[in-house]
Amino acid sequence: MGRVRPTTMDGRPLEALELEHFPGLCERQITAMAQRLQQQHRAGAILVLHRVGRLAPGEPIVLVAVEAGRRGAAQRCAAALLEELKHHAPFWKREWCAGQGTWLAENTPL
C-alpha cells in the first residue's frame, strides 16, 4: 500500500495532494499494465485500487495485491506494478502547501 507523502517535491510540509484522472482511459491503462506484468512475472490474480481526489498526508493512495504460486514472484510483480503506476499511469497531481496549489510535471522518486 502506498501513502501520501508528508512533504512537497521541494521538501515543504504538504497540506494535501490532489489527483485527477481521465475516467475510462486511466482504468484501461492500469489494467493493461497489470496484465503485462502478470504475464511477465507469472502471477495469478492482481488487484489495484487507486484513489483520486484530495488526499491528506499519510492517507492511503494506492493498494496493489498480487497472487502467485511463490512469494517472490508476487513481491516482484507488486513492486514493478507500483513503479509502473507511479511513472506511467495517467494521473494529474497537484500539491497543496500554504493554501497554494502547484501542478506537478513529473512524479516523485522512490
Which residue stretches match the model-derived regions?
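N-terminal, polar/charged subdomain of small-to-medium soluble alpha/beta proteins
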Residues: M1-I61, E67-L110
